[in-house]
UniProtKB/Swiss-Prot annotation:
InterPro entries, per the entry: Ald_DH/histidinol_DH, Histidinol_DH_CS, Histidinol_DH_monofunct, Hstdl_DH
Full protein name: Histidinol dehydrogenase
Enzyme class name: oxidoreductase
Membership in a protein family: Belongs to the histidinol dehydrogenase family.
PROSITE patterns: HISOL_DEHYDROGENASE
Cofactor(s) demanded: Zn(2+)
EC number: 1.1.1.23
Primary gene name: hisD
Biological role: Catalyzes the sequential NAD-dependent oxidations of L-histidinol to L-histidinaldehyde and then to L-histidine.
Disulfide bonds: none
Lineage: Bacteria, Bacillati, Bacillota, Bacilli, Bacillales
Assigned keywords, A-Z: Amino-acid biosynthesis, Histidine biosynthesis, Metal-binding, NAD, Oxidoreductase, Zinc
UniProt-annotated binding residues for NAD(+): Y127, Q188, N211
Amino acid sequence: MEIVFEDFQKALSKIKLLRENANIIEETVQRNVSEIVRNVRESGDEALSFYTKKFDGVKIKEFRVSEEEEKRASMFVENSFLEALQEAKKNIISYHEKQKRQSMFDCASEGIIRGQIIRPLENVGVYVPGGTASYPSSVLMNVLPAKLAGVKKIVMVTPPREGGIDPHILVAASLAGVDEIYTIGGAQAIAALAYGTESIPKVDKIVGPGNLYVALAKREVYGIVNIDMIAGPSEIVVIADETGNAKYIAADLLSQAEHDERATAICITTNIELAKKVEKEIERQLETLPRSEIARESINRNGAIFIVPSIDEALQLSNEIAPEHLELHIKEPMNALAYVKHAGSIFLGPYAPEPLGDYLAGPNHVLPTSGTARFFSPLSVDDFVKKSSFLSYTEEALRDVQHHIVELANKEGLHAHARAIQIRFEEEE
């Protein structure tokens, strides 16, 4: 892992280059995704079967997971896993319940009523990755906010594999309250949820993380359905001063690096000695890490330690990066919170490591990446509702303001708009 001594602008340029390298998308991948989406839209289940055999090596007769298979799954999971899942569910619910909002009813003045109605989405599709790891935690993080919002039907898709779906995923889905589960993955699953097929119902919104093909497919179908966000590779920035613990920092950087070779792990510190210790500690921990090959590639390609003169400059640099995860291993981290403008999720102090947020604390782990924390937010209850405004005016209330409306409409050249107001107050013949 490279230790970099640069001024602010050079450091920022280097970080941007790291991110750009992590987000390079080959044109052939985009073309492949577009073709998959088009074929699923046109051929439905036939295309799903073809791509499932091609990419997953599995021939599936029935895409939907039976209730019997869901029930059997509990026989193959450990009690300790169930206890952990239930604790996570409790915390996720208690946190997200506080995000719920009420409809608004405003009697602005005599004869005027206006407001906003908040209603849940009717159908939501949740993508749960398979790939190199299984993510029961993603089931809870994506499904529970939707349930709290009041979504009527939640459909889950997850890639098939020999021997069936991981029972831990099925148990998590049952605990969270998923209504239907289908064994499809990749871009073809996203297309199926967006357009519907003979077997897969069309949904109103698709949420959940996935690989590059999934992310590009979500971008492709956005507008046909809504999506949560287009997630890039995982990323973490750790800001540390001389009080930082090198073992903790190295472990936290590797916790993101093990996700994906394209993940980004960056440490920004004011202390050169700590930087050297973190570098050595990363090498030491990599030796025993089960997913060391992935993590090492990520660290070598997209990892770095930056030396800066002050924590203020470290925070400025982090704000320019707008990372998915930001850890503050500094004195009085709570005091620095006010200066963090852009980050998906912020972890304060040495005993609030990123995996705490990933699994158990309650805040959502579906977070904006690739600098989009400047304008996107973590997944929340708000993502599963829609809002409609309403208004009511009496004849007298409209009469009082008619001249303003006519003036504005005529100024914009929309004379039928003006006429729609004027006609209500003309003398009837």
